[in-house]
């Protein structure tokens, strides 16, 4: 079975950009949190964690939980987190769960 998920993390202009593609669900939740959390040391004091979700094809409550876990980790580290290129299906989940204050969109 082909892998339906990928995450690439890179430093860009003092920010950490995590590009997520495929299905963001329970099967990949721990991988997302550990991969991105491990990169937070590379953020400048005025930098951000940018979660680029433009290639996400599916997100369930576990995927949302991973994003909220990352939000808590960035908050604890004094780093801002924003979501970029949020697909309509993910936007609907964010709207239904009323987490816009926790997960602002760019």
Task: Give the positions of each predicted feature.
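STAS-like cytosolic regulatory interaction modules
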Residues: 1-58, 69-106
């Amino acid at each position: 079975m082909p892998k339906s998920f990928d995450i690439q993390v890179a430093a860009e202009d003092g920010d950490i950009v995590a590009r997520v593609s495929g299905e963001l669900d329970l099967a990949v939740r721990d991988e997302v949190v550990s991969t991105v959390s491990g990169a937070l040391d590379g953020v400048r004091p005025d930098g951000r964690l940018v979660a680029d979700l433009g290639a996400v094809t599916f997100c369930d409550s576990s995927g949302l939980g991973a994003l909220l876990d990352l939000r808590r980790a960035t908050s604890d580290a004094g780093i801002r987190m924003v979501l970029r290129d949020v697909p309509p299906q993910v936007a609907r989940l964010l709207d239904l769960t009323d987490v816009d204050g926790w997960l602002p969109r760019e």
